[in-house]
């Protein structure tokens, strides 16, 4: 049976995800509805992607009995309301990262999903790329020995993009780019809670974080660090080092196709998406997370074993603590 998707928001990321679903077997994935706050945009999106239903409100999509799972592709500050709306209507939910602007928002969504017995997952698509799965397998086999340190960098000049510098929309580097770095460090260290977090950073003139460097100390004397920036070009690589060697995820580390493990270079081609155009780098790789959601739902799972809800809560806690350390608050923090 095909998994029936409803797309919440007709923006660029939603377009890429819908394009990807169209490359997968129709017997497994079908997009049955799209909603935008402007009906004309929803209709235009539906025409482009050949979707049977277009709604001018998220409420209408949530009420559509044909929708099994909702993909939330709105801006960060709108995630919570959209997720809670879809959960209240009995839908499974895949929500773009970051799930919430702060830890309180994430906890509220997680509690709602658990109380209703519904599937909820944060769309950290990176974790489903074969290059990352290969690294995880190597770590679990002890290929790198005892782990000591992990590091990640993600930075580009996004200051010309209004959303990236918009304080009201919780812009800045941490929530958009830093989450990729911290999820990598959290992944290689097994989702442990850091014992100590220290951060330094500069703010952009609008009040969002511009460039931030973070040091995380974990139990057992291991540590991770990352730098993220919306104004500086960084290496956009990630690595983990142990007593027997180093594993490197090459640029683009947030959607990687290359892994160097103890000097051995491995390539993992993207899934085929002939004649398809994407708005974001390696957009075809969204297929991996879509397949994972279907597998979880077919097994009757309420959360992903790869991105468990407790880890989504932990990532939100860490990001919030970093923001406090560098003095960045958003309007959503006072609600």
From Swiss-Prot:
GO terms for molecular function: D-xylose 1-dehydrogenase (NADP+) activity; nucleotide binding; trans-1,2-dihydrobenzene-1,2-diol dehydrogenase activity. SUPFAM superfamilies: Glyceraldehyde-3-phosphate dehydrogenase-like, C-terminal domain, NAD(P)-binding Rossmann-fold domains. Liver and kidney. The record marks 176 as: May play an important role for the adaptation of the alcohol substrate into the binding site. Strongly inhibited by isoascorbic acid, 4-hydroxyacetophenone and 4-chloromercuriphenylsulphonate. Stimulated by various salts. Its EC number is 1.3.1.20, 1.1.1.179. InterPro entries: Gfo/Idh/MocA-like_OxRdtase_N, Gfo/Idh/MocA_domain, GFO_IDH_MocA-like_dom, NAD(P)-bd_dom_sf. The record marks 71, 79, 97 as: May play an important role in coenzyme binding. GO terms for biological process: D-xylose catabolic process. It is an enzyme of class 1 (oxidoreductase). The keyword Transcription regulation does not apply. Keywords: NADP, Oxidoreductase. The record marks 180 as: May play an important role in catalytic activity. This is Trans-1,2-dihydrobenzene-1,2-diol dehydrogenase. It comes from Canis lupus familiaris.
């Amino acid at each position: 049976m095909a998994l029936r998707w409803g797309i919440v928001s007709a923006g660029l990321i939603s377009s890429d995800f819908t394009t990807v679903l169209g490359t997968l077997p129709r017997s497994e994935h079908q997009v049955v509805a799209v909603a935008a706050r402007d009906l004309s945009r929803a209709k235009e999106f539906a025409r482009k992607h050949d979707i049977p239903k277009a709604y001018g409100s998220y409420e209408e999509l949530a009420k559509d009995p044909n929708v099994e799972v909702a993909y939330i592709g709105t801006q960060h500050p709108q995630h919570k309301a959209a997720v809670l709306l879809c959960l209240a209507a009995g839908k499974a939910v895949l929500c773009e990262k970051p799930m919430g602007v702060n830890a309180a928002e994430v906890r509220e969504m997680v509690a709602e999903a658990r109380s209703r017995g519904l599937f909820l997952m944060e769309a950290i698509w990176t974790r489903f790329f074969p290059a990352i799965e290969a690294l995880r397998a190597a770590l679990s086999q002890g290929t790198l020995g005892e782990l000591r340190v992990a590091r990640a960098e993600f930075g580009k000049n996004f200051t010309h993009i209004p959303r990236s510098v918009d304080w009201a929309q919780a812009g800045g580097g941490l929530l958009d780019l830093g989450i990729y770095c911290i999820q990598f460090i959290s992944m290689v260290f097994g989702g442990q809670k850091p014992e100590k977090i220290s951060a330094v950073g500069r703010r952009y003139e609008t009040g969002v974080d511009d460039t931030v460097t973070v040091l995380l100390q974990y139990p057992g004397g291991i540590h991770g660090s990352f730098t993220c920036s919306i104004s500086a070009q960084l290496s956009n690589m990630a690595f983990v080092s142990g007593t027997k060697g180093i594993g490197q995820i090459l640029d683009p580390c947030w959607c990687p196709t290359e892994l160097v493990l103890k000097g051995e270079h491995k390539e993992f081609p993207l899934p085929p998406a002939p004649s398809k155009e994407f708005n974001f780098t390696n957009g075809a790789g969204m297929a991996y997370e879509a397949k994972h959601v279907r597998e979880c739902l077919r097994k009757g799972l309420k959360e992903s074993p790869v991105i468990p809800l407790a880890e989504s809560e932990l990532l939100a806690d860490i990001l919030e603590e970093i923001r406090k350390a560098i003095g960045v608050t958003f309007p959503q923090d006072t609600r």
